[in-house]
UniProtKB/Swiss-Prot annotation:
It catalyses: adenine + H2O + H(+) = hypoxanthine + NH4(+). Gene3D superfamilies: Metal-dependent hydrolases, Urease, subunit C, domain 1. Belongs to the metallo-dependent hydrolases superfamily. Adenine deaminase family. InterPro entries: Adenine_deam, Adenine_deam_C, Amidohydro-rel, Metal-dep_hydrolase_composite, Metal_Hydrolase. This is Putative adenine deaminase BC_3012. It comes from the Bacteria. Keywords: Hydrolase. Signal peptide: none annotated.
Length: 589
C-alpha cells in the first residue's frame, strides 16, 4: 500500500530524519549534544537515575549507560553534580495579556517552561482562519513548543457571536494538528441548559481524541458531575483544596492555579495535603494567563517551588509540571520525560529543590547556558500575518460623552462587579475626587456604537485612561475628566493601540500595543517595568486592587458575576438581560 505523502508533512519527523536518528546509534553519525553523567528524573521509575543523554537536532535519541562512538560534531557537557529534569509545560496559557505568544515564551524559557498550550481566542476574534493557521505554522519555527486550544464561545455577549462561533470554523480548528483541546467552557450554562450545537462540538472534540477544558468557578458537586457527563475532562477553577478534591472525586483531572488574580496554589496544596491526598498524578499546574509583572521571577518554576515548600514530594512536584500534563494530553511520546524519542526540552538544575534551571534546552537548542540567556532573538514577523497596529479611522468628541444612564458597574475586587445606581450628577465635564465614581465608555473598535455608564470602585483621582486592550477588542475609556479621557484616547489612536493614562490634558504614562491594539512587541523585562509603573500610578490615584489590566480586560467578561459592559450593552449576567443598550456615536468624523 502506498501512502500519499505529498504536500504538507504531517509527521513529527520525516522518514529521512528518523533514519538519521538511528544512524547516530549505529555510530555512523555524530550526536550533537551529549549530557554526560547526568543525574536525571526518570518519570517512569519515579526516581533519580544516572545516565548519558544523547541529543541529535531536536530529539533525545538515547538515554542510558553507553557513550556515542562518534563525537566529531558533538558538544560534551559534564552534568556531574547537576540534576536534569524535563522542560516544564504551561497547559493553560492566554498569551496575549499585553505580551505576545513569542515574548511570553522567550521569557518563560529562561525559567524552564518550554512548552505552552495556548488560548486561540484573540487569533479567532481578529484573524481569518487561513491567516491564523499560517501563524500557528510559523510558531513551529521558534524554540518553544506551541500548542493551542479551540474556544467554543467568546466569554462575552457579542453582536455577531453566533456567526463568529459557527460549526464550520470550530470543526476546522479542532481538526488542526496543533490544537489539543476544546474550551475553556466559559459558556457552560448554555451547554448545560440545552445548547446542542455546543454539545456537538464537545462530542467532536472527544471523537478526535482531544481534551475538553472546563471553566467552572464555584460549581457545586452536582453541576460538576453533570458537566463531566457532558464530556469535560479537566477544570482549573478550584480556589480551595476542597474544591480541587471535589473535582478529583468527580473524575476530573485538576489543574491547580496560581495567577495574578487568583494566587491560590499555596492554600490549595495545604488543604489537599490536610485532606490526606498522597497521589498527585491527576494534578498539574497553571498560571492561567497572568499579567507581565506576575512573571518577573518566572512561571512554572514558582509553582514547583511552592509545592516543594508545602510538602509535596519533590518528584511529584516536577511531574505536575511536565509528565502529568504530557500524559493527560496524549503527547507523552514527545513531551514530559527524559527518555529516548522525546523532544529535547531539558532543564539542568543546580539542586533538586531549586527549579530555576542554570541551563535550558528547547528543541535541542540552548536558550539558556550557565545562567546566561542565549536566545534573545524574535522570529515572528507579525505584519506578514495581518497582525498590525490598530487603525482607528474615527474620533470622538465631547458631544459623544453623554452620560444619562444612572445604572452602572460597582467594582468589588480585581474582577467581580455588581450593578449600582449612581446618586451623583454625572451630566457634567468633570467629577469630584471626593468619591470613587468615574465616567466609563466602551466604544466599538470600528466606532459604530458606544455604551456610556458610570463605574464605582475603579479610581478616585484618575484624569483619564484609554485602552484598546479589552475583552472584546473594543475601546475602553475611564476617568473623572472628559478632556483627559479624550487626550488618552487620541494618544491610543496615534500609537495604533495601547493603554494610556492622561492627567491635566497631558499623557502621564503609556504602554504601546502595536499588535492589534492588544499586544506589545517589547521584550518581557521591559514590558514588566511599564506595567508596574501603570499599576503604581493607578494605585496612587485610588485604584484599590492589584491588577488593573485584568479589571479592564474583564469588564466585558460574562463568565463572571454580576454585571458587564458588552457590545450588546450593559448586561446583567444572572438574568441574561440587557440593562442599557448601546447607542450610535453622534457622527462619524
Amino acid at each position: 500500500m502506498e501512502l500519499n505523502t505529498m504536500g504538507k508533512n504531517h509527521y513529527k519527523w520525516s522518514n529521512k530524519q528518523l533514519r538519521e536518528h538511528v544512524e547516530v546509534l549505529d555510530g555512523k553519525r555524530s550526536t550533537h549534544i551529549l549530557l554526560k553523567n547526568a543525574t536525571y528524573l526518570n518519570s517512569y521509575m519515579r526516581e533519580w537515575m544516572t545516565a548519558n543523554i544523547w541529543i541529535y537536532n531536536d530529539r533525545i535519541v538515547y538515554v542510558g549507560e553507553q557513550l556515542p562512538e562518534q563525537l566529531t560534531e558533538c558538544e560534551v557537557v559534564d552534568c556531574e553534580g547537576k540534576y536534569v529534569v524535563p522542560g516544564y509545560i504551561e497547559p493553560h496559557a492566554h498569551p496575549y495579556q499585553l505580551y505576545n505568544p513569542e515574548t511570553l515564551a522567550n521569557h518563560a524559557m529562561q525559567f524552564g517552561t518550554t512548552t505552552f498550550i495556548n488560548d486561540n481566542l484573540t487569533l479567532f476574534f481578529t484573524l481569518k482562519r487561513e491567516e491564523a493557521f499560517r501563524l500557528l505554522d510559523e510558531f513551529n519555527k521558534i524554540p518553544a513548543s506551541m500548542y493551542w486550544w479551540c474556544r467554543f464561545d467568546g466569554q462575552t455577549e457579542l453582536q455577531n457571536g453566533e456567526s463568529l462561533f459557527n460549526s464550520e470554523e470550530i470543526i476546522e480548528w479542532l481538526q488542526h494538528e496543533a490544537v489539543l483541546q476544546g474550551g475553556e467552557l466559559t459558556a457552560w450554562p448554555k451547554l448545560l441548559h440545552g445548547d446542542d450545537e455546543m454539545l456537538t462540538w464537545v462530542q467532536e472534540t472527544k471523537r478526535l481524541q482531544k481534551k475538553v477544558e472546563g471553566h467552572f468557578p464555584g460549581a457545586s458537586e452536582t453541576t460538576l458531575a453533570k458537566l463531566k457527563l457532558l464530556g469535560t475532562d479537566c477544570d482549573h477553577e478550584a480556589m480551595t483544596g476542597q474544591e480541587a478534591f471535589t473535582r478529583l472525586m468527580q473524575g476530573y483531572t485538576v489543574s491547580l492555579r496560581n495567577s495574578s488574580i487568583r494566587p491560590d496554589l499555596e492554600v490549595i496544596l495545604k488543604e489537599l495535603l490536610e485532606l490526606g491526598v498522597k497521589q498527585f498524578d491527576r494534578f498539574f499546574f497553571t498560571t492561567d494567563g497572568s499579567h507581565p509583572s506576575f512573571y518577573e521571577n518566572g512561571m512554572t518554576n514558582v509553582m514547583i517551588s511552592t509545592a516543594i515548600k508545602q510538602g509535596v514530594p519533590v518528584i511529584d512536584a516536577y511531574d505536575m509540571a511536565s509528565y502529568n500534563i504530557a500524559r493527560y494530553y496524549n503527547m507523552e511520546h514527545v513531551h514530559g520525560s527524559i527518555a529516548t524519542g522525546r523532544i529535547a526540552n531539558i532543564n539542568i538544575l543546580e539542586s533538586k529543590e531549586n527549579p530555576v534551571p542554570i541551563s535550558v534546552l528547547a528543541k535541542g537548542k540552548w536558550v539558556k547556558r550557565d545562567g546566561v540567556n542565549t536566545h534573545e532573538a524574535l522570529h515572528i514577523d507579525w505584519s506578514k500575518h495581518k497582525v498590525t497596529p490598530l487603525s482607528l479611522d474615527w474620533s470622538i468628541e465631547k458631544e459623544d460623552m453623554i452620560f444619562s444612564n444612572k445604572t452602572g458597574i460597582h467594582l468589588l475586587n480585581n474582577v467581580i462587579t455588581k450593578p449600582y445606581t449612581s446618586e451623583i450628577n454625572i451630566d457634567c465635564d468633570e467629577l469630584s475626587t471626593d468619591h470613587d465614581e468615574c465616567f466609563f465608555m466602551m466604544i466599538a473598535r470600528d466606532g459604530s456604537w458606544q455604551v456610556n455608564i458610570a463605574v464605582k470602585g475603579f479610581a478616585k483621582e484618575l484624569g483619564g485612561l484609554a485602552s484598546s486592550y479589552s475583552g472584546t477588542g473594543d475601546i475602553i475609556l475611564i476617568g473623572k475628566r472628559k478632556e483627559d479621557m479624550l487626550t488618552a484616547f487620541r494618544r491610543v489612536k496615534e500609537l495604533g493601540g495601547g493603554m494610556v493614562i492622561a492627567e491635566k490634558n497631558e499623557v502621564l504614562h503609556e504602554i504601546a500595543l502595536p499588535l492589534l491594539g492588544i499586544m506589545s512587541n517589547l521584550k518581557m523585562r521591559e514590558l514588566i517595568q511599564e506595567e508596574k509603573q501603570m499599576v503604581k500610578l493607578l494605585q496612587e490615584r485610588g485604584y484599590a486592587h492589584d491588577d488593573p489590566a485584568f479589571t479592564i480586560l474583564f469588564f466585558s467578561a460574562t463568565h463572571l458575576p454580576f454585571i458587564r459592559v458588552t457590545p450588546i450593552g450593559l448586561y446583567d449576567v444572572k438574568s441574561s438581560k440587557v440593562v442599557a443598550p448601546p447607542v450610535n456615536l453622534i457622527k462619524q468624523y
